[in-house]
Swiss-Prot record:
Organism of origin: Paulinella chromatophora
Protein name: Cytochrome b6-f complex subunit 8
Cellular compartments annotated: Plastid, Organellar chromatophore thylakoid membrane
Main location: plastid
A UniProt-annotated Pfam family: PetN
Molecular functions per Gene Ontology: electron transporter, transferring electrons within cytochrome b6/f complex of photosystem II activity
Self-association and partners: The 4 large subunits of the cytochrome b6-f complex are cytochrome b6, subunit IV (17 kDa polypeptide, PetD), cytochrome f and the Rieske protein, while the 4 small subunits are PetG, PetL, PetM and PetN. The complex functions as a dimer.
Gene Ontology annotations for the cellular component aspect, listed alphabetically: cytochrome b6f complex; organellar chromatophore thylakoid membrane; plastid
Residues in the signal sequence: none
Length: 33
């Protein structure tokens, strides 16, 4: 259970960081980090 939860949070954090990079490179101006 704990290992599954750890992998789930790791996958969510990884996909979130990828989304941040994609949105940052889009340059639409709605989100600037």
């Amino acid at each position: 259970m704990l290992i599954t939860l750890g992998w789930a949070s790791l996958a969510a954090l990884f996909s979130f960081s990828i989304a941040m990079v994609v949105w940052g490179r889009n340059g639409d101006g709605s989100m600037n980090f």
